[in-house]
């Protein structure tokens, strides 16, 4: 059924309202013990100050926060009184709202149509972002180490590129292990998924589990793993049987690197990785361009100086290549398209960039733990509202006008309308829909993705049919 834009946004408004209506927040605050009797600062006021009104709950002064709350809702509070209300129950309240939102149906109808969707029901992107917190919280949020990382919060996110649906989420200490979280995410896999993983989540066991569950993967290969390929000249016993230890030989990756031109791709046929535990898989080598090599060397120098991590000589020698492993069928994703498909994971970097540059989730002053956590979960709720709205707008703009939306531009514009959304949610879904229609009109006019650098966009790689500058574009996946 092809619904109108208004009907689509009305359904979205109803789902949003269902989780954030003032009466529901008041009831939830009582259930969770944040409010035990009628007070001037209740669940709706906490949500107002942490989600909607203040952009700097952790960095503005308490006097300023009291002023913002008074302007928005009327209650007059003292700085000391407000600070007391940032307690464990307040954190639990905001955490519950965020959990209910990201597990809701807000993004269930936001999936875009693409050639990639024919083969992969979900394209799962997993990554983490980390930021420092006050040093006195190091016992609660120990950092990841390195220079000035005594205390930090790490946020792990896995989401579906087609719909924007959050699949797995974790807020924890900066020292939390990426690989452990990646393994935990296996429980939510479904046949037909494609998982794109970077080096921090690399695990032979996890890749093997994906393969057994009918899930495809594309992953960078850690250089401490050896690649073996079928020996064209194996040794034989006198009876004509092949000597098992000569059936496969180790691949000289450095030698292959020197034979490739910048931007060239090479696939090692009939290969496996691992010594003790073998994983038979496709192995693809991509030769970086000179520009990409310079960028990588800069990152390596930064990592060595800031985080105290030393790269091995082998890693430095193989700086010029990316090695990918994948179990995707070659007829679905040929070797020439593997690097482009892997680059889809950089979309999550755009999401994380908005968290810091637009929402300033990493900004704080020296405050108590509960106020910092209220800030983090309040920001995450606002971020999810904006990102889920963006993914819905992206789907509608493609469906109705065949245009590609810029995720970064759109989230910024939606953030500018948070105060209007807040006022609408205090009333009804009809008013919310009006605000969303205004937003859609704005995004249609000013939110289109730029193609200035002639780089492939996410739509190009995924094989989405769309129009740009009046021309209809239909690119195969890559």
Swiss-Prot record:
Q: Does the keyword Transmembrane helix apply?
A: no
Its domain of life reads Bacteria
> Is Protein biosynthesis a UniProt keyword of this protein?
no
A GO MF term: transposase activity
Give the record's GO biological process terms: DNA transposition
Q: Which cysteines are joined by disulfide bonds?
A: none
Which keywords describe this protein according to UniProt?
Answer: DNA recombination, DNA-binding, Transposable element, Transposition
Cited InterPro entries: RNaseH-like_sf, Transpos_IS4, Transposase_11
Q: What does this protein do?
A: Involved in the transposition of the insertion sequence.
Sequence similarity: Belongs to the transposase 11 family.
Q: What is this protein called?
A: Transposase for insertion sequence element IS231C
Species in which this protein is naturally found: Bacillus thuringiensis subsp. berliner
């Amino acid at each position: 059924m092809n619904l109108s834009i208004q009907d689509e946004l009305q359904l979205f408004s109803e789902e949003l309202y269902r989780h954030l209506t003032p009466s529901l927040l008041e009831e939830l605050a009582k259930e969770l013990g944040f409010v035990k009797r009628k007070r001037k600062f209740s669940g709706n006021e906490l949500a107002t100050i942490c989600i909607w009104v203040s952009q700097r709950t952790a960095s503005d002064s308490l006097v300023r926060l009291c002023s913002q709350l008074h302007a928005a809702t009327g209650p007059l509070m003292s700085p000391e009184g407000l600070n007391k209300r940032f307690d464990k129950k307040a954190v639990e309240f905001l955490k519950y709202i965020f959990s209910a939102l990201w597990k809701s149906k807000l993004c269930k109808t936001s999936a875009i149509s693409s050639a990639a969707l024919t083969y992969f029901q979900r394209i799962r992107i997993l990554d983490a972002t980390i930021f420092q917190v006050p040093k006195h919280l190091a016992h609660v949020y120990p950092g990841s180490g390195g220079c000035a990382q005594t205390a930090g919060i790490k946020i792990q996110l896995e989401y579906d590129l087609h719909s924007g649906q959050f699949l797995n989420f974790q807020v924890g200490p900066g020292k939390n292990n990426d690989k452990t979280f990646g393994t935990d995410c296996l429980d939510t896999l479904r046949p037909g998924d494609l998982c794109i993983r970077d080096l921090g989540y690399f695990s032979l066991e996890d890749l093997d589990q994906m393969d057994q569950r009918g899930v495809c993967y594309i992953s960078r290969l850690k250089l401490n793993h050896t690649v073996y390929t079928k020996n064209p000249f194996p040794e034989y016993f006198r009876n004509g049987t092949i000597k098992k230890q000569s059936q496969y030989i180790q691949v000289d990756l450095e030698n292959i690197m020197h034979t490739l031109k910048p931007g060239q791709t090479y696939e090692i046929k009939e290969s496996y990785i691992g010594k003790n535990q073998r994983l038979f898989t496709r192995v693809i080598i991509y030769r970086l361009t000179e520009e990409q090599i310079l960028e990588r060397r800069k990152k390596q120098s930064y990592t060595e100086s800031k985080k105290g991590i030393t790269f091995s000589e082998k890693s430095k020698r193989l700086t010029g290549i990316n090695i990918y492993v994948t179990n995707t069928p070659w007829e679905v994703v040929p070797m020439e398209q593997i690097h482009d498909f892997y680059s889809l994971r950089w979309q999550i970097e755009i999401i994380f960039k908005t968290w810091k540059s637009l929402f300033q989730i990493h900004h704080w002053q020296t405050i108590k733990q509960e106020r910092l956590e209220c800030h983090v979960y309040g920001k995450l709720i606002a971020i999810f509202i904006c990102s889920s709205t963006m993914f819905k707008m992206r789907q509608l703009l493609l469906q109705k006008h065949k245009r590609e939306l810029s995720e970064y531009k759109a989230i910024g514009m939606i953030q500018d309308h948070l105060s209007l959304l807040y006022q609408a949610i205090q009333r009804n879904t009809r008013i919310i829909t009006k605000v969303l229609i205004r937003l859609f009109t704005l995004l249609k006019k000013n939110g289109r993705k730029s193609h200035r650098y002639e780089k492939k966009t996410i739509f190009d790689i995924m094989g989405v049919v769309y129009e740009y500058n009046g021309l209809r574009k239909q690119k195969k996946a890559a």
